[in-house]
């Protein structure tokens, strides 16, 4: 069986992404053929900062020795200074993501692994950008769901990067139905669960307390869950968020759907931040990202933890092999 070819996109060049890619290249792997979509000078600078070897190869050349890294070059406008993002390089960051996505959509690649990006630097460079998840969804022309996962729990989000005051208005029947259908399909296809058990959190404290603490559960969530149960989905909820993550309850769920970002993710990150990854469900190819930021204060110092990138790469390879 041929191993999948995956794009490795480091993200913000001034952050820890490039050095994490260099660290990843020190262990040639048998589960995937990785191709970095990055600036070669930045990768060489990262290798020098870490005192590690890197040998950049043609995209189709196999990585056989520590430091071998096939490269699809993405040229930056200015040289990288670790720890200091330059808005002039925003176009290169976006070009790396879009080029990798285009190659996936064309069938030349089977998945994407992404490092952390610096949203402020991209927007300061004159490019409107809210997140890589949204960018890839727009390019593929399909709705997606953001899921974060570690070895303990998988959490999918109905809403993502919204101000808290806007969340309640965004919890609609259509949004919830779409999120749950995408999550259910991904659990079946990507994780091999024929009948996934999906817990759904309520929006309000105590899941609305029978309407006394808000009516979203009664008016929106419960009718949506009943509709999907009629389609054969195994859904639990709506559950109060403050007790849904108890270990004895989590053992009965394959995934948890949270209504908003900070409802579901703090518990996940507390339970295993280093191994956590960000998965985009619903794309025609697997995309898995690290679950940490650019860590500018660590960039170029050789002390950044590669665990999340290693976990993201291993998971993306497994998901790609199932497609």
Swiss-Prot record:
What is the catalytic activity of this protein? Answer: 4-(phosphooxy)-L-threonine + NAD(+) = 3-amino-2-oxopropyl phosphate + CO2 + NADH
Cofactor note text: Binds 1 divalent metal cation per subunit. Can use ions such as Zn(2+), Mg(2+) or Co(2+).
* Principal subcellular localisation of the protein: cytoplasm
List the InterPro entries hit by this protein, alphabetically.
Answer: PdxA, PdxA_fam
**Entry keyword set:** Cobalt, Cytoplasm, Magnesium, Metal-binding, NAD, NADP, Oxidoreductase, Pyridoxine biosynthesis, Zinc
The cross-references to Gene3D superfamilies, in alphabetical order and at most eight, read: Isopropylmalate Dehydrogenase
Q: Name one Pfam family in it.
A: PdxA
Asked if NAD is a keyword of the record, the answer is: yes
GO CC terms for this protein? cytoplasm
Q: Which cofactor does it need?
A: Zn(2+); Mg(2+); Co(2+)
Top-tier EC class: oxidoreductase
Q: Where in or outside the cell?
A: Cytoplasm
Q: In which pathway does it act?
A: Cofactor biosynthesis; pyridoxine 5'-phosphate biosynthesis; pyridoxine 5'-phosphate from D-erythrose 4-phosphate: step 4/5
Q: Which residues are involved in binding a divalent metal cation? A: 161, 206, 261
Q: Where does substrate bind?
A: 133, 269, 278, 287
Quote the EC number. 1.1.1.262
Q: Which GO terms describe its molecular function?
A: 4-hydroxythreonine-4-phosphate dehydrogenase activity; cobalt ion binding; magnesium ion binding; NAD binding; zinc ion binding
Q: Name the GO terms of the biological process aspect.
A: pyridoxal phosphate biosynthetic process; pyridoxine biosynthetic process
According to the record's subunit comment, the protein's assembly and interactions are: Homodimer.
Q: What else is known?
A: The active site is located at the dimer interface.
| Annotated family | Belongs to the PdxA family.
HAMAP family xref list? PdxA
- Role: Catalyzes the NAD(P)-dependent oxidation of 4-(phosphooxy)-L-threonine (HTP) into 2-amino-3-oxo-4-(phosphooxy)butyric acid which spontaneously decarboxylates to form 3-amino-2-oxopropyl phosphate (AHAP).
Official protein name in the record: 4-hydroxythreonine-4-phosphate dehydrogenase
Q: Which source organism? A: Xanthomonas axonopodis pv. citri (strain 306)
Q: What is the lineage of its organism?
A: Bacteria, Pseudomonadati, Pseudomonadota, Gammaproteobacteria, Lysobacterales
């Amino acid at each position: 069986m041929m191993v999948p070819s995956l794009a490795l996109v480091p993200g913000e060049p001034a952050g820890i992404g490039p050095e994490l890619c260099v660290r990843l290249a020190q262990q040639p792997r048998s589960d995937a053929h990785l191709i970095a979509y990055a600036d070669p000078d930045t990768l060489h600078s990262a290798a020098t900062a870490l005192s590690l070897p890197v040998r950049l190869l043609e995209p189709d050349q196999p990585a056989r020795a520590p430091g071998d890294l096939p490269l699809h070059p993405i040229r930056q406008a200015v040289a990288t200074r670790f720890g200091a993002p330059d808005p002039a390089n925003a176009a290169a960051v976006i070009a790396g993501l879009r080029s990798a996505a285009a190659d996936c959509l064309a069938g030349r690649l089977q998945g994407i692994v992404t490092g952390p990006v610096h949203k402020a630097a991209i927007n300061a460079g004159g490019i409107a950008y809210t997140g890589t998840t949204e960018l890839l969804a727009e390019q593929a022309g399909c709705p997606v769901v953001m899921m974060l996962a570690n070895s303990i729990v998988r959490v999918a989000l109905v809403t993502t990067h919204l101000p808290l005051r806007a969340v309640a208005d965004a919890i609609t029947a259509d949004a919830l139905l779409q999120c749950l259908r995408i999550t259910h399909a991904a659990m079946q296809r990507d994780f091999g669960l024929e009948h996934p058990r999906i817990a759904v959190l309520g929006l309000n404290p105590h899941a609305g307390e029978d309407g006394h603490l808000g009516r979203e559960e009664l008016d929106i969530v419960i009718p949506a869950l009943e509709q999907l149960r009629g389609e054969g989905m195994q859904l639990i909820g709506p559950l109060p968020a403050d007790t849904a993550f108890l270990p004895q309850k989590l053992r009965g769920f394959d995934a948890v759907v949270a209504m908003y970002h900070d409802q579901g993710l703090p518990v996940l990150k507390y339970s295993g931040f280093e191994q956590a990854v960000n998965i985009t469900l619903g794309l025609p190819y697997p995309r898995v990202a690290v679950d940490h930021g650019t860590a500018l204060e660590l960039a170029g110092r050789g002390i950044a933890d590669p665990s999340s990138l290693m976990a993201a790469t291993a998971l993306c390879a497994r998901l790609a092999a199932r497609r």
